[in-house]
């Protein structure tokens, strides 16, 4: 609808390439009429200063006070995670009161996988001269230093979160509204979704600018789980004529949301918009120089001015993607963040990710169909074909079904049923993202963020999500649990897929090799052993060996490259496993030297049985991408390849 972005409703309500056109009307959040007789708390701002192992916590309380209401005091109580209390009482002067806490042994807040997430309870009471409480405020505070490092380095200008002095490799996904009818979203639903993120080893999440500012409980849960929040302001894929009335409206919007959210430990940065700098720079969407000037005013003057006044310790980024603003090459691979879509929209192969050393990838993705049970929720049996009217209406990206089938033709034999097509599409999605994330983690330091588009759906639909509308994990979410693991072993293989753009070409002179890498995203050195084997389809071993592994904290190490060019292309595969010093399995995987559709798989003779809470699966041969269908909506502890071994799935 023309002008819909000026309504300050979620842009995606008016249709997106994963969501329906279902705009709402009216006020959808609670409205309160507050009255007071003497004074009330108008605003509270908490500032942190970290120095030499201590933290100074300054609480500034601004009061709204009737002229003749007398003297008021503010009592601030800080309760540590262990229950210890500190109290400071301050008398207001000219409508302001300040309380300061100095913590000599602070418990610091860390992102998921880097440490704990201790939260301090800060309680503020406004008391009159008789000690009667007139107003109150209660929040959870995490103690941390958090910014974005943009230091110059050998690759250009880095872009990474730095938390308590530690540079973090961001791993996560982009969050869109959880329901097209946003009043249906509940704290329990959001908690389940975000817990699924933490369970898959996410440490970050991007709130995309085409939706809405989530409720307080969203950020409370992120604080508890250690999920760093990249927070877009709510502008996406549009331009504006900046009138005085619109400027006044959006400025009030900025102030309201910054004040509401700034105390959260998980809030990592504010970002001006989604993809608008990039497309305005390309001359798209804009119809006049005035609109281009208004863009600069909105995102490089108005928002920074609000943040300087309301949240001066926050990091602001003008757009995503961006290299720093002012239309200066927003997709520069040597600085800032990028959205990379040549895999999928550009139809380039998965291996193309390996050609790029971005600094921070805030969007890249691949579509798949939702789980079969989800498809059954909106189709009759006669509709269960991806080109049926109903199925096409649940695919909002017009050319996407064709793209899925294009990539399918490169990798797999044509599925014999819709259920197998769903399975194959989810494997394609998961493996595409695996190529990208594993590559960028192998180049930690140059790249410091891999954020997948997208996390979730707002209705039952074919999309880029890793969790569908009903909360069912697609294959991608299981893969994310593996390739976002704190310690990751991965393999850069060379074979047909990496050397031939046409997988049907004869592979004369083909290089076949395996190059293992171990990425350690923990705060401790990792020591262990990498075991490898070259195997036949029945899982029998042709060659095997091992490498001793030592990986410093927060780094990635390459192991020696191995050449297998003299072995068969279609009947050998390479498997690998990482063990710690105690012999415990840390990670594993396998690679082929050809497209899976051409590999000469043997019957693995799969067998599965249930024992207590475990599903035990055995295989006598190589079984790749085994899916367990439990007959109920359950999340399994693992889904994996089998090499002729026992696998336990809880």
Predicted region positions:
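Active-site neighborhood of glycoside hydrolase catalytic domains
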Residues: 224, 241-327
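Flexible loop/turn segments at secondary-structure boundaries
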Residues: 23, 149, 177-180, 212-215, ...
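Active-site-adjacent substrate/metal-binding segments within catalytic domains
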Residues: 7-8, 34-39, 43-45, 133-238, ...
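Substrate-binding clefts and catalytic carboxylate motifs of secreted carbohydrate-active enzymes
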Residues: 19-26, 39, 270, 305-308, ...
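Secreted/periplasmic carbohydrate-active enzymes, especially glycoside hydrolases
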Residues: 1-204, 334, 442-443, 447, ...
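Extracellular/periplasmic catalytic domains that process cell-envelope and extracellular macromolecules
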Residues: 162-163, 260-264, 310, 352-355, ...
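Generic detector of well-ordered alpha-helical packing
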Residues: 18, 30, 173, 232-233, ...
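Active/binding-pocket-proximal capping segment
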Residues: 224-227, 235-236, 456, 533-536, ...
């Amino acid at each position: 609808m023309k002008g819909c972005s000026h309504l300050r409703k979620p842009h995606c309500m008016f249709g997106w390439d994963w969501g329906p056109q279902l705009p709402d009307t009216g006020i959808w959040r609670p409205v309160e009429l507050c009255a007071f007789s003497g004074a009330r708390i108008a605003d509270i701002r908490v500032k942190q200063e970290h120095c030499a192992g201590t933290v100074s916590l300054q609480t500034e309380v601004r009061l709204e006070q009737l002229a003749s209401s007398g003297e008021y005091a503010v009592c601030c109580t800080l309760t540590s995670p262990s229950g210890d209390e500190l109290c400071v009482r301050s008398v207001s002067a000219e409508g302001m009161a300040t309380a300061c806490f100095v913590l000599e042994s602070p418990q610091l807040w860390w992102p998921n996988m880097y440490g704990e997430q201790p939260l301090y309870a800060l309680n503020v009471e406004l008391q009159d001269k008789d000690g009667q409480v007139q107003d109150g405020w209660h929040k959870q505070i995490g103690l941390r230093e958090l910014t974005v490092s943009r230091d110059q380095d050998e690759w250009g200008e880095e872009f990474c979160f730095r938390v308590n002095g530690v540079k973090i490799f961001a791993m996560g996904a982009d969050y869109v509204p959880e329901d097209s009818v946003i009043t249906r979203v509940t704290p329990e639903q959001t908690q389940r979704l975000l817990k699924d993120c933490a369970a898959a080893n996410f440490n970050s999440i991007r709130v995309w600018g085409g939706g809405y500012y989530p409720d307080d409980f969203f950020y409370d849960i992120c604080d508890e789980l250690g999920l760093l929040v990249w927070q877009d302001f709510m502008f996406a894929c549009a331009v504006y004529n900046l009138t005085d009335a619109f400027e006044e409206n959006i400025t009030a919007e900025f102030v309201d949301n910054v004040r509401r959210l700034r105390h959260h430990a998980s809030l990592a940065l504010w970002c001006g918009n989604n993809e608008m700098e990039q497309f305005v720079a390309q001359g798209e969407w804009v119809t006049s120089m005035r609109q281009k000037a208004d863009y600069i005013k909105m995102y490089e003057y108005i928002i920074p001015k609000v943040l300087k006044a309301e949240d001066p310790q926050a990091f602001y980024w003008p757009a995503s993607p961006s290299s720093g603003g002012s239309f200066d090459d927003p997709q520069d691979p040597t600085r800032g963040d990028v959205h990379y879509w040549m895999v999928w929209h550009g139809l380039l192969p998965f291996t193309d990710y390996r050609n790029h050393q971005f600094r921070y990838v805030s969007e890249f993705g691949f579509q798949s169909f939702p789980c079969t049970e989800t498809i059954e929720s909106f189709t009759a049996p006669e509709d269960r074909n991806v080109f049926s009217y109903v199925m096409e209406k649940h695919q909002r990206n017009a050319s996407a079904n064709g793209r899925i089938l294009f990539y399918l033709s490169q990798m797999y034999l044509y599925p014999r049923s819709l259920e197998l097509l769903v399975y194959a599409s989810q494997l394609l999605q998961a493996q595409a993202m695996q190529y990208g994330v594993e590559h960028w983690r192998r180049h930690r330091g140059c790249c410091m963020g891999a954020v997948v588009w997208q996390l979730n759906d707002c209705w039952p639909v074919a999309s880029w999500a890793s969790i569908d509308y009903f909360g069912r994990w697609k294959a991608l979410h299981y893969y994310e649990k593996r390739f976002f693991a704190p310690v990751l072993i991965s393999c850069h293989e060379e074979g047909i897929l990496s050397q031939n753009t046409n997988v049907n070409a004869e592979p004369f002179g083909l290089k076949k090799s395996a190059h293992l890498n171990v990425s350690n995203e923990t705060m401790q050195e990792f020591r262990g052993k990498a075991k490898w084997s070259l195997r036949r389809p029945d899982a029998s071993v042709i060659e095997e060996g091992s490498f001793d592994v030592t990986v410093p904290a927060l780094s990635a190490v390459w192991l020696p490259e191995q050449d297998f060019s003299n072995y068969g292309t279609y009947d050998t595969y390479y498997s690998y496993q990482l063990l710690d010093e105690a012999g415990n399995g840390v990670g594993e995987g396998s690679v082929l030297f050809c497209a899976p559709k051409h590999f000469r798989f043997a019957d693995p003779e799969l067998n599965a049985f249930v024992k207590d809470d475990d599903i035990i699966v055995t295989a006598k041969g190589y079984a790749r991408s085994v899916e367990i269908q439990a007959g109920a909506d359950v999340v399994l502890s693992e889904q994996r390849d089998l090499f002729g071994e026992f696998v336990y799935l809880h």
